Amino acid sequence: MQRRTFIKSISAMMATSTTLGCVSNSLATEKHVSITDFGLRPNSGDDAIPALQKALAYCKKHPGTSLIFPLGRYDFWSTKADRDFYYISNNDDGIKPVAFPLTEFKNLIIDGQGSRFVFHGGMVPVIVRESSGITLKNFSVDWDVPFHCEGIVEAVNKKESYVDLKIKDGFSYKVENGRFIFVGEGFENPVIKNLLEFDTKRQKQAYMARDNFQREIQPVTTEIRPGVLRLQGKYPTWPKVGNTLLLMQERRDWPAFSVQDTKNTWLENIDIHHSGAMGVIAQLADGIKLDNVNIHPKDGSGRTVSTTVDATHFINCKGHVVLKDCLFQGQIDDGTNVHGMYARVAEIHDSNTITFELVHYQQLGIDIFKPGSKVNFSDSVLNVFHDNVVDKTVRQDAKYWTVSFKEPLDTALKVDDVLDNMTWQPDHVMISGCRFTGNRARGALLTVSGKIIVENNYFSTPMMAIKIGSGGLKWYESGPVESVEIRNNIFDNCNYAKDSSAIDIVPGRKSKATTPYHQNVKIYQNEFRVYNERVLTTSRTQGISFVSNKIVKTSEYPERKSAFAPIHVERSSNFVYQGNDFIGFGHSELLFIDGQLVSGSGKLEGEG
């Protein structure tokens, strides 16, 4: 197996010469080394970084080594960690201290043997870059002081527009000049991005609680007594006394794992209890598997939040992407995203050459087009009208690249059209035996052309459980899908924070186009437990089947009337609907096909 990372480690290089002399020759032949051989003991409270730098320098010189951490707690401080500038897609770029900078490693196993890795200050635990055959297993990741803040609502005064909040133990902050400031080990952040209400008993986003984005206008904050804050400002939905209010900071600086330009990366038996960004972010990874990777607050911590944004995210990866027996709980965004990245045509130079732009500021610097890559070009409504092969690329800066193609470009090409790398797409995406619950936003966002299988999972998410979209004007996430099977899953009262369907298959750019975008989606033998009656919404999809599913009406949340039918189909063809069992609905108007409600028993077949 292989794994790889992305850092140019200056301090590790400096440590190499002294390290190798400290390790006996017998260790080099055994291919197993212990972190204790480099002077670090578990539960010592010492900074693990100096010993780890020596150990990694040794492992880099000896491909095929297993680095063992005997069971215990290990502490990592940012002050002595290797630093480099990183572009990490969908996160914030910048100079980042990294505990495990695995750049240009081969066939390395890091085995924590059940240990707890605790990090201090702003840092990234692991970056795997330009490496192959990397396995990371058997440890947990956490921070002593988290990057966000949580409190229990003590009082709500709508007339004077404030909420009183008792801050939970274990969170650090200060108030200066009427402003709340996040305080961590070695960092401060004065900007609240979002105030979000969670149901304390359910440990889920509160029913129909909306995002309360702050950013430009921060709440006026007063500490009315020790540990109790009064937050005065606007609230689109008012929290309830006794519920939990999350104070989320704006930055995405500190993901737990970043995987970049790698081949065959495995994460096994890992708990990610917290991070100051995503849990696992992979870009341009050729083969990546997460097996029993559990993202959730540590038991007994009193925390509601695990990762401060998505649990996992995979961008322009190829080969296989596998999520097996994972838990995604408490992340303040989606459980997983698997997609490509559209680039915008910024300038057309001649018949073979363009300059493209990476649009979103958190996608800059990612070299998504390489010589030999097959590229599709799409118009404003995402119809593919041309394909070509990259001949050469010239990077202008982090935002713009000039690209020459092997064949003449289509004369219909214009500025603002988009291009997508079809070479860097997964052949196979498997999500099996996973649990998505207790988060903000969606479960799985899937928009790649390879074979996608979603089976034997449990979804209980505040928005869509499965979103097949792409093409939005903000993130420029590419698609479409060509082969999806969604089978034997449980969808348990999703959409309790937004009126939407459990499964939503709609392109991200709104248009009146009737041409197919997605194709070949099979949804069968699933159980949908729904309080709001909404099950499936699809548009511009060719070849969709909804077969042998069980749909049960529940009273888990207050019923909400919707303008959408349980099965809502627009501008789609080859629609197959049969053998479905609706329980507790009390009416037969279950289908909406291109403007017409259709009554049926669940055994209708036809084309929309």
From Swiss-Prot:
A lipid is attached at C22 (S-diacylglycerol cysteine). PROSITE patterns: PROKAR_LIPOPROTEIN (PS51257). SUPFAM superfamilies: Pectin lyase-like. GO terms for cellular component: plasma membrane. It is found in: Cell membrane. Coiled coil: none annotated. Its main location: membrane. It is an enzyme of class 3 (hydrolase). GO terms for molecular function: alpha-galactosidase activity. PbH1 repeats lie at residues 262-292, 318-340, 426-448, 449-470, 481-507. The keyword Nuclease does not apply. Keywords: Cell membrane, Glycosidase, Hydrolase, Lipoprotein, Membrane, Palmitate, Repeat, Signal. The keyword Hydrolase applies. Disulfide bonds: none annotated. A lipid is attached at C22 (N-palmitoyl cysteine). It catalyses: Hydrolysis of terminal, non-reducing branched (1->3)-alpha-D-galactosidic residues, producing free D-galactose; Hydrolysis of terminal, non-reducing alpha-D-galactose residues in alpha-D-galactosides, including galactose oligosaccharides, galactomannans and galactolipids. Its EC number is 3.2.1.n1, 3.2.1.22. It is a lipid-anchor. InterPro entries: Beta-barrel_GLAA-B_II (IPR056441), Beta_helix (IPR039448), PbH1 (IPR006626), Pectin_lyas_fold (IPR012334), Pectin_lyase_fold/virulence (IPR011050). Residues 1-21 form the signal peptide. Belongs to the glycosyl hydrolase 110 family. A subfamily. Alpha-galactosidase that specifically removes branched alpha-1,3-linked galactose residues present in blood group B antigens. Has no activity toward linear alpha-1,3-linked galactose residues. This is Alpha-1,3-galactosidase A. It comes from Shewanella woodyi (strain ATCC 51908 / MS32).
